[in-house]
From Swiss-Prot:
Family classification: Belongs to the bacterial ribosomal protein bL34 family.
Keywords of this entry: Ribonucleoprotein, Ribosomal protein
Protein name, as recorded: Large ribosomal subunit protein bL34
Gene: rpmH
Any one GO BP annotation for this protein: translation
PROSITE patterns referenced in this protein's UniProt entry, alphabetically: RIBOSOMAL_L34
Chain intervals with Basic residues compositional bias: 10-19, 26-44
Entry superkingdom: Bacteria
Gene Ontology cellular component list: ribonucleoprotein complex; ribosome
Amino acid sequence: MKRTYQPSKLVRKRRHGFRARMSTKGGRKVLTARRARGRKRLSA
């Protein structure tokens, strides 16, 4: 059986990166919440 996590830097950036977050309303909400919480890293 193939494992579910097959790492790819490109896919990671595209799906969970900063620009991907900024491109949707919900994503911007995520960044706002992470900033409010004081997260060092906002996105992948």
